[in-house]
Amino acid sequence: MNELQRVQFEILCEFITVCKKLDLQYYLICGSALGAEKYKGFIPWDDDIDVALPRSDYLRFIEEGQKLLPDYYFLQNCKTDKNYHHFCSKIRDSRTTYVESDQKNINMHHGVFIDIIPLDLLPDDKHFSIKYRFFRICQLIHLKSPETYKNIIKFVLRPFVPISVVYSVFEKYLNKYSSKTLSEYCNFHNAKNNRLYMHKDIYGKGINAVFEGKDVVIPERIDEYLTLYYDDWRAELPEEQKAGHHYYEVLDLERPYTDYIEKTTHNGRRMKLRKTKKSIG
């Protein structure tokens, strides 16, 4: 694994330790599950780690996980970092810097991270789909766009759509289903709707796998999971598709992200970025 992957792997190991202490069900998902099954570790060109927990376990991790993690790890979500506007949580390494290109002007924690995603038991019906689309629109208003005109529109709309209120209302809606007998898990972090829902039996109790020499848990019906997610997951990708999907503005595995923040008299704190990008090889 490369140096970035090594830092992410260390975070994963601490995450697993906390899950074991709290007796929480977790799964490696998405490319991390594919990596465990196909490569016994990272997909060689992958640049992130994704893990998921059923919502009840996710909420317990959010509530109790921080105090069980090393002091240099920060459990980031919209409640612990007011400028973080994503549905999932992250564990970030405060000793490092990883500023993604689309977040370079956002004053939030910018350490190297892994994603922690809740799996929600929810009905697959028209009314819920409408509510979900409304939530996504509200969320996107608070995220940067490549196009300048979209950012101007979003800037005008933001005061009328406070993200903390949106998250609070939607989370209450999600929580009311967490104890009900439903058959579908929903991964809201996945933007591709055809992969949004999967039967919870596909995840099941999980099965053991090896990831870079570490025992991990992946979905129980892993072949079915990966087939639904990637179609022919055993096939080799063309060389031009062998690339990560995160684009960084600054990557520094030896200095904390706070070294890249400066104070200004008019705008409070803002990101101060180096002109060159550091290699992760």
Regions inferred by a protein language model and the residue ranges of each:
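Conserved catalytic core of two-metal-ion nucleotidyltransferases
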Residues: 1-20, 65-124, 143-146, 154-231, ...
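The substrate-binding groove and active-site-proximal loops of carbohydrate-active enzymes
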Residues: 1-7, 45-52
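Active-site nucleotide-donor binding segment shared across nucleotidyl transfer reactions
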Residues: 16-49, 58-59, 201, 228
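A surface-exposed partner-binding patch
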Residues: 34, 41, 47, 54-59, ...
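General alpha-helical segment detector with a strong preference for membrane-spanning helices
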Residues: 35, 52-54, 119, 217
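Short, basic, helix/turn surface patches
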Residues: 52-62, 265-267
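A short secondary-structure junction signal
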Residues: 126-131
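Short, cationic low-complexity segments
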Residues: 135-150
